[in-house]
C-alpha cells in the first residue's frame, strides 16, 4: 500500500483462473456449495465496496474476475473506479433499508434528494424501478432464510422488464445521477452471473449484516480517525496477503 497514492495505482501479478471457468467446473461436477461460496464472496465484496467504502470497481465483467490457487476471488483492473460522495452512499443505503421494510414514501423522497426525476414529477416509475432492482433482496429477507434465495428464471425476468418498460413509456425517468448509472452497470453485470448459476445464498443474512454495521449506519466517523485517506485495499474491505 506504500506504493499507492491519490495519483498512483500500483499493480501486482496474481496467479489465478477466470472466474467463469472455475464456476463452470464446479457446476459440471454438481458442487453447488463451491459455486455458492464463490458468488457469495463476490456479492459480499461489492456490498462492502459500495455500502461501507463508498468506492467500487465499476467494471466487474468476467474477464476482470479470477479465482486464485487458494480459492479467493481476485478483482483485476481498477482503472474504472467510482467514488460515491458520502451523501450518495448514505442515500443508497437508506433506499435499501426502506425497500426491505416497504417504506415507499422514504424511497421516493430519498431518490428525489439524490437527483432522480420523472417527466411528471410523480415517483411511480422510480418506485417500479426500485422494485425491479431490490424486490429480490426484500423477498430473500422475509421469506427464504438460510435455505437460500430462489433467483428468477428467464420468463419471470422478462415479465419484470416488460412491466417496467410500460411504466417508463407512460412516465419516463428524465434525470439519473451518473453514480447510479455505474452502480446499475455493476449489479446488472453481477446479476447475470447469479441468474446463470443460480447459487443458494442466504441473502437475508448477508444484507442484515450491512444493515447493522456502524460503518454503514454512520455511527462511526470514517474520516475522523485518519487525516490521510485509507489505503485502497482497506476502503474496499480487502485483506493484504501479509495478514492472511
Protein language model features and the residues they cover:
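Conserved kinase catalytic-core helix
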Residues: 30-58
Amino acid at each position: 500500500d506504500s506504493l499507492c497514492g491519490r495519483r498512483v495505482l500500483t499493480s501486482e501479478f496474481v496467479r489465478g483462473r477466470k472466474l467463469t471457468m472455475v464456476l463452470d467446473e464446479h457446476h459440471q461436477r454438481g458442487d453447488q456449495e463451491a459455486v455458492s461460496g464463490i458468488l457469495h464472496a463476490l456479492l459480499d465484496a461489492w456490498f462492502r465496496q459500495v455500502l461501507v467504502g463508498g468506492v467500487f470497481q465499476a467494471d466487474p465483467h468476467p474477464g476482470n474476475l479470477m479465482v486464485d490457487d487458494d480459492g479467493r476471488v481476485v478483482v483485476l483492473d481498477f482503472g474504472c473506479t467510482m467514488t460515491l460522495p458520502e451523501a450518495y452512499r448514505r442515500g443508497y443505503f437508506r433506499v435499501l433499508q426502506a425497500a426491505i421494510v416497504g417504506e415507499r414514501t422514504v424511497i421516493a423522497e430519498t431518490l428525489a434528494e439524490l437527483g432522480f426525476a420523472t417527466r411528471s414529477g410523480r415517483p411511480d416509475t422510480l418506485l417500479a424501478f426500485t422494485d425491479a432492482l431490490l424486490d429480490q433482496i426484500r423477498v430473500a429477507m422475509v421469506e427464504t432464510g438460510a435455505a437460500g434465495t430462489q433467483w428468477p428464471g428467464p420468463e419471470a425476468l422478462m415479465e419484470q422488464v416488460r412491466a417496467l418498460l410500460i411504466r417508463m413509456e407512460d412516465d419516463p425517468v428524465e434525470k439519473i445521477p451518473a453514480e447510479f448509472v455505474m452502480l446499475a452497470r455493476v449489479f446488472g453485470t453481477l446479476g447475470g452471473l447469479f441468474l446463470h448459476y443460480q447459487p443458494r445464498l442466504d441473502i437475508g443474512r448477508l444484507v442484515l449484516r450491512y444493515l447493522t454495521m456502524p460503518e454503514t449506519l454512520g455511527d462511526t466517523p470514517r474520516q475522523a480517525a485518519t487525516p490521510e485517506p485509507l489505503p485502497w485495499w482497506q476502503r474496499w474491505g480487502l485483506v493484504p496477503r501479509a495478514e492472511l
